[in-house]
Design a protein with these regions (language model features):
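Cap/insert and terminal regions of metallo-dependent hydrolase folds
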Residues: 69, 163-169, 173-269
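Short, structured coil segments at secondary-structure junctions
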Residues: 50, 81, 115, 238, ...
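Active-site metal-binding loops of divalent metal-dependent hydrolases
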Residues: 8-10, 37-40, 65, 90-91, ...
Length: 275
């Protein structure tokens, strides 16, 4: 399995562009996959620099409805006219960032409904084939990140906290190894790992995910106690390797690295990993 980070908040190559968002290309035994499309066309530009043919993608996935992951979806659908895109069925909700200073829509562009024939809506565990499994829901709320606190869903005239029902995660089994892909892990990376373990009967070999440990409303990482607790859970899975970035934040990554050492590394835009 070859994993290429098309877009992330940072870059490891001078010929790449970066922006707050995430897009990952996965070349597996049976499939040529795209996981998230970032906020705009930048993932396409970077793909060209990296020699990744977006037209050759045969299946795509959206981790959740936030615009830093789905903003490039329309551009993908226009560039690639054949790949189905798997979406959790709650992606069409009204998702907002709500702070004392703003109430800003951060969800899917409803104009994308014109591509409904390309979309495959999922719920719970969806086994696509022996290589690909999607899952959502059925998770606890341990190690909850308060970086989620400004994320809301509009329901009538109210803005309750987002329950992240629209978030889904992907398991890819290829070459005898299983990788877990999670966009922002709003539901908590530990909770997502536990659900993946229930499905697999073991821990995944590799994890690629943002851990949502940077709080943008405070411009600061989550408290060290939370980061240490998450690190302890990750470290206990001694045979699992982690690649993180995006909403984890650089300071939180450094703190995780202190505890996990070689068990964790950063996934900058332009990084290529052979699994």
């Amino acid at each position: 399995m070859k994993v290429t980070i098309l877009l992330e908040n940072t870059v490891c190559r001078s010929d790449m562009k970066c922006e707050h968002g995430l897009s990952i290309h996965i070349a597996a035994d049976k499939h040529n996959l795209l996981f998230d499309m970032g906020p705009n066309a930048m993932f396409l530009e970077n793909a060209e620099q990296l020699g990744v043919d977006i037209k050759a993608v045969d299946i795509a996935f959206l981790s959740h409805a936030h615009d830093d992951h789905c903003g490039g979806l329309e551009l993908f659908l226009k560039r690639n006219d054949r790949a189905p895109v798997y979406l959790q069925k709650e992606v069409w909700g009204e998702y907002y960032v709500v702070t004392p200073d703003k109430c800003e829509y951060a969800g899917m562009d409803k104009a994308l409904h014109r591509f409904d024939d390309r979309f495959r809506l999922t719920e719970g565990v969806t086994v696509i084939d022996d290589e690909l499994t999607l899952f959502s829901g059925g998770m606890g709320r341990d190690y909850w990140s308060h970086a989620n606190d400004t994320l809301c869903e509009k329901v009538g005239d109210d803005f309750p906290k987002d329950a992240f029902r629209h978030e889904q995660d992907l398991l890819v089994t290829s070459g005898g190894r299983t990788a877990l892909f999670a966009g922002c892990a709003h539901n908590g990376i530990v909770n997502i790992l536990r659900r993946a373990e229930e499905i697999l009967g073991r821990s995944p070999d590799v994890v690629f995910a943002g851990f949502h440990l940077f709080n943008p409303s405070l411009n600061a990482p989550e408290p060290r106690a939370l980061i240490d607790a998450v690190a302890g859970e990750l470290k206990a899975r001694t045979n699992t390797k982690y690649y993180t970035g995006h909403c984890t934040g650089l300071q939180a990554y450094r703190e995780l690295k202190e505890m996990l050492g070689d068990q964790i590394d950063y996934m900058s835009g332009g990084s290529v990993f052979e699994i």
